[in-house]
């Protein structure tokens, strides 16, 4: 019998929903890159339910208790007296989501003597210190691809919102105003602009595809160049380095994983290379940007706006400057946990657990660290530096 420790975000302030705004969600079985959606043997939830909060339990309790395991669910994850720390020493499996991550740094991984599997319900496993996971022989897995489109839709929404000045204009409408000039003095069309992505994996590529019909000029920087066919189909300009790309872009969207190479990539020096009046949308990871350099750039007017849904730490403190800096279009970390996205990554979490308990290999796409090294998607998307230490 194993102890499974699951860290989820708190329920809504008015309690766990009894009804939902919609009765069903579209059933997506194959992603646009041909990867099939998760294929667990069974699920104990209805797609479209809230699964990522504490009472939702990722729909796993019936399954795990049916196998005789102990299943602990909590949102209390910070500090030495937290529920999370209390159960850490004897948990065999730890499950959390990027939106409310159970940070597993070197100290916590050293304490987690029985830990065998760190499972991310969602995409992005940088809340786990991968070097330490490698050292301790912990398998790290995530549900690659499950919510890529969820995130890319959010990013496209944010690009349009910033450029067209949607949020301030909406606020005028709510306040009873009809201040057309106030609304439009920062409102532009995206048509004809130069839009570039940092990384062109599933999310970056999906954003490029969705932006193409807006008749913009598309640019990208990536570690692995796309095929000639893809470049021609989307009319993409490839850049060998980020500096060259940002010089020509009106909008930069960040879609890279966080690892030593991308940490603080958008610092004072990089932002200075951008056009005055450019916009940044970051739905990847907060630490790819230098927090205070972003604040200074929007305050000085060098950036016309910054939007994203990722923060450091998560949850972000109430006084985090990105909440109140001018021309921000921030949301809490929600893009990948739409009810549509969470239906898929929850099914994927179930698939990974079924494989684990039945001794079958986990889908290659879902593996980040295995057998003491980067593997699967991890080997493609992440780097680890031998002497690099993360601080959370």
Please state what every model-predicted region is.
Residues 72, 219, 287:
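Conserved beta-strand positions in the Rossmann-like core of class I SAM-dependent methyltransferases
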Residues 89-90, 114, 247-248, 273-276, ...:
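Alpha-helix C-terminal capping/helix-to-coil transition sites in glycosyltransferase folds
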Residues 124-127, 142, 146, 202:
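Residue-level detector of alpha-helix initiation sites
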Residues 140, 277-392:
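Rossmann-like dinucleotide-binding domain for NAD(H)/NADP(H)
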Residues 136-138, 143-194, 206-209, 213, ...:
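Phosphate-binding beta-alpha-beta segment of Rossmann-like dinucleotide-binding domains, i.e.
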Residues 2-139, 267, 388-392:
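An N-terminal-biased, well-structured beta-alpha scaffold segment characteristic
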Residues 26, 166, 181-276, 296, ...:
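Rossmann-like dinucleotide/phosphate-binding beta-alpha-beta segment
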């Amino acid at each position: 019998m194993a102890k499974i420790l699951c860290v989820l975000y708190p329920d809504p302030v008015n309690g766990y929903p009894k009804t939902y705004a919609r009765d069903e969600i579209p059933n997506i079985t194959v992603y646009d890159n041909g990867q099939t959606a998760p294929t667990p043997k069974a699920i104990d939830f209805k797609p479209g339910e809230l699964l990522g909060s504490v009472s939702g339990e990722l729909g796993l309790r019936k399954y795990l208790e049916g196998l005789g395991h102990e299943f602990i669910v909590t949102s209390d994850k910070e500090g030495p007296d937290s529920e999370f720390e209390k159960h850490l020493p004897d948990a065999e499996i730890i499950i959390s989501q990027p939106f409310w991550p159970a940070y597993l740094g070197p100290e916590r991984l050293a304490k987690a003597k029985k830990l065998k599997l760190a499972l991310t319900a969602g995409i992005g496993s940088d809340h786990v210190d991968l070097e330490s996971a490698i050292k301790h022989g912990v398998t790290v897995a995530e549900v690659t691809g499950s919510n890529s489109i969820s995130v890319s839709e959010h990013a496209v929404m944010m690009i349009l919102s910033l450029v067209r000045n949607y949020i301030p204009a909406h606020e005028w409408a709510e306040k009873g105003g009809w201040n057309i000039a106030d609304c439009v003095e920062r409102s532009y069309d995206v048509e004809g602009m130069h839009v570039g992505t940092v990384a062109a994996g599933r999310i970056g590529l999906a954003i490029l595809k969705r932006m193409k019909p807006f008749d913009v000029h598309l640019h990208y920087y990536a570690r692995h160049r796309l095929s000639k066919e893809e470049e021609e189909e989307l009319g993409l300009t490839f850049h060998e380095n980020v500096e060259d790309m940002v010089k020509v872009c009106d909008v930069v969207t960040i879609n890279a994983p966080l690892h030593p190479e991308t940490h603080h990539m958008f610092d004072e020096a990089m932002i200075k290379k951008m056009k005055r009046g450019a916009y940044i949308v970051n739905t990847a990871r907060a630490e790819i940007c230098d927090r205070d350099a972003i604040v200074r750039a929007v305050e000085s007017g060098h950036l016309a706006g910054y939007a994203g849904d990722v923060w450091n730490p998560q949850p972000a403190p109430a006084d985090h400057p990105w909440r109140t800096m001018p021309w921000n279009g921030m949301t809490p970390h929600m893009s990948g946990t739409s009810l549509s996205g969470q239906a898929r990554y929850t099914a994927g979490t179930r698939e990974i657990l079924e494989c684990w308990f039945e001794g079958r290999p986990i889908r290659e796409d879902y593996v980040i660290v295995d057998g003491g090294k980067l593997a699967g998607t991890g080997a493609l998307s992440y780097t680890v530096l031998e002497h690099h230490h993360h601080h959370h």
